[in-house]
Swiss-Prot record:
A motif ('KMSKS' region) lies at residues 271-275. PANTHER family: CYSTEINE--TRNA LIGASE, CYTOPLASMIC, CYSTEINYL-TRNA SYNTHETASE. This is Cysteine--tRNA ligase. It is found in: Cytoplasm. Monomer. One of its GO terms (biological process) is cysteinyl-tRNA aminoacylation. GO terms for cellular component: cytosol.
């Protein structure tokens, strides 16, 4: 099997992946700020790094996967105040909702899922170390800021220089900062802050800045120098750039070896975002499409490419997934273990080892499905299920998927017992040689999204289309 190569944002190139410790991978991914339901952009991040950790494990690595939860933040505080509820009540509720969405999408839970509020002492310890090392200062407004000009390599991840940033970036004016580009490490508490929004420190009551949270959690849980850090493309700057400045400023050593970023979700060629009002929650999508269809929709696009969201693309994903399940419908896979020397497995592995190239991996699944359709071979059917399983797909009994179709998208459609009753009426019509009535029932069911397949021996199977 070829070596795994991943695109490292820091190097701006694909690189052979070499872990710091042979056979072990330590990976941190920036998770979700929990003040609302997860949207399609969150779904993409969750699925992408679920695929990454699944593949790392599949090729033999022992993985420690950390994905954090941001449970203290200005948006969280505002939403809690608007709702008239405590911060903990709000965040607990949306963490539960996030876990429900993850389960629906087949996301395997990370090995460690830290909440930011559990690591306040570690954040303060890192801030104090930065202050001791000359990178941090307390401003006249009480905030503690990071002095970006003190960090010689600031901009190495994003490729942005300080001069370019000062000339071209919109930076909120703050007379208390030594430099407009300096960012906050510790925010001084405000009189109107609700309970649970601030902690005691040598700098006064306050709460951590967004960037220090991930630096402290990553270094505490995975060590000061680890293998992979992931997140959405929108986090590359300033969040991940600032994480590097903080972590390396505090420890004096390299923070992360490989940086991975998934691309944006787009609607009509614009980034999906709340500010543009063109975003959809995972729950809204799952009202109309089966969760595995949504997962497949995400999987079949390369993780670094833009993902174009539309009903047309989801409908196509549903039709494509139906083709894969249909190939398995009447074949009982054998029970052998996956053999990486098998030709289809080799091609699948080559694709995944080429920067998690899921479009090529999925194309291999369709070639394999075509062979299963042609030969009805139990070994090929087993390979199809096993390889798809590494992507979190084809885990259901084929008839269950085909008859359930788009899941809740069929709310209000014919129920299974109604379909069976009409099939029975069609059988009776055929037995009475009333073929016109039998054809009418078939056409009526097809109009309702139900396709019939007459089998040898007189039985009839059905599936939703």
């Amino acid at each position: 099997m070829e070596s795994l190569r991943i695109y490292n944002t820091l190097a701006r190139d694909k690189q052979v992946f070499v872990p710091r410790q042979p056979g072990e991978v330590r990976m941190y991914v920036c998770g979700i700020t929990v003040y609302d339901y997860c949207h399609v952009g969150h779904a993409r991040m969750l699925v992408v790094f679920d695929l990454v950790q699944r593949w790392l494990r599949a090729i033999g690595y022992r993985v420690t996967y950390v994905r954090n939860i941001t449970d203290v933040d200005d948006k969280i505080i505002r939403r809690a105040v608007e709702n008239g509820e405590s911060i903990k009540s709000l965040t607990d509720r949306f963490i539960g909702a996030m876990h429900d969405d993850e389960a629906a999408l087949g996301i395997q839970r990370p090995d460690i899922e830290p909440r930011a509020t559990q690591f306040i002492p570690q954040m303060l310890g890192m801030i104090e170390q930065l202050e001791a090392n000359g990178y941090a200062y307390q401003a006249s407004d009480g905030d503690v800021n990071y002095s970006v000009r003190k960090f010689a390599n600031y901009g190495k991840l994003s490729g942005k220089s300080l001069d370019d940033l000062r000339a071209g970036e919109r930076v909120a004016a703050n007379d208390a900062k030594e430099d407009p580009l300096d960012f906050v490490l510790w925010k001084r508490a405000k009189a109107e802050d609700p309970e649970g929004a601030s902690w005691a420190s040598k700098y006064g009551m306050g709460r951590p800045g967004w960037h220090i949270e991930c630096s402290a959690m990553g270094c505490t849980l995975l060590g000061e120098h680890f293998d992979i850090h992931g997140g959405g493309q929108d986090l590359q700057f300033p969040h991940h750039e600032n994480e590097i400045a903080q972590s390396e400023g505090a420890t004096g050593q390299t923070f992360v070896n490989y940086w991975m970023h998934n691309g944006f979700v787009q609607v009509d060629n614009e980034k999906m975002s709340k500010s543009l009002g063109n975003f959809f929650t995972i729950r809204e999508v799952l009202e109309r499409y089966d969760a595995e269809v949504m997962r497949f929709f995400i999987v079949r696009t390369h993780y670094r490419s833009p993902l174009n969201y539309s009903d047309v693309h989801l409908d196509d994903a549903r039709a494509s997934l139906t083709r894969l399940y249909t190939a398995l419908k009447d074949v009982e896979p054998d029970a052998l273990a996956l053999d990486w020397n098998e030709p289809y497995a080799q091609r699948f592995a080559a694709a995944m080892n080429d920067d998690i190239n899921t479009p090529v991996a999925v194309a291999t699944l369709f070639e394999l499905a075509g062979e299963v359709n042609r030969t009805r071979d139990a070994s090929l059917a087993r390979q199809l299920k096993q390889l798809a399983g590494l992507l979190g797909l084809l885990g259901r009994e084929p008839r269950a998927f085909l008859q359930q179709g788009a899941g809740s998208a069929h709310a209000g459609a014919l129920a299974a017992d109604e379909i069976e009753a009409r099939i029975a009426a069609r059988v009776a019509a055929k037995q009475a040689k009333d073929y016109a009535e039998a054809d009418r029932i078939r056409a009526e069911l097809l109009e309702a999204g139900i396709a019939l397949e007459d089998k040898p021996g007189g039985s009839t199977e059905w599936r939703r289309v």
